[in-house]
């Protein structure tokens, strides 16, 4: 769930803020034990790299800083929202359930035309994360996605990937 929260934070409107040590897997409890010493030499390197990749995506696309937001899908433990502007159209899907969830996402609401294709920039699930692209064709203004259990995906229109 932590990585899903980070994905939302890096794609939601506003400036994302990381609390000291979160990127390394630092745990804390209630005050005064809410922040411990940084775990030098014991960092969660996979989690650090996950943060780096999401920060890179956030920096690479102006839409995350100044674009609009629109809810595209809302079901029990499954949400999808779009971030869009005149240059980029991006879908973020979050599945917090223990089951695979499938959904048709109405990308036409962000102005995506039927012949457009979209590609996944990142997938995060129980196994870790991947930036391996997967292409989603837009059919009748929709993309069909299959979200693994406890997963998040960032999907972007290919025409503006540059």
Predicted regions and their residues:
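Carbohydrate-interacting/catalytic domains
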Residues: 2-5, 11-18, 22-162
